[in-house]
């Protein structure tokens, strides 16, 4: 069973675009449907970890909103961080899924039981499942739904919405 999902931010939770306002503040767009899926996943007692190569106050804010307690930014070696999280949670890569979109996600995607990439990820990433949705446009929701359905938890999970 998948107990934890590892999420990349740029290109997975967002569409990989960064916008700066007139004050130089960074802005990103997050898909609300991804957020609902994450919240419902957490209500099942599952875990979520954000591991991203960049640092952004916006990511911290989004993680707070969704009550994600594992948030690691400015990470060079995502595999090493994922290993530490799994150790802390008493889990292994056999209990993990991950979504990534670029070369810096390769090692973690190769290690997990179920790997995903958004429709617009680089083609060189070899994953178990290529999603139909683009990053920042429902890819994380699609990933969670596929996991939930494969583990026969969809009815319980979907009740979290009502």
Cite the ranges covered by each PLM segment.
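Alpha-helical substrate-recognition element adjacent to the catalytic core
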Residues: 1-77, 160
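Mg2+-dependent phosphoryl-transfer enzymes with acidic/Ser/Thr/Gly-rich catalytic loops
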Residues: 24-28, 66, 70, 79-162
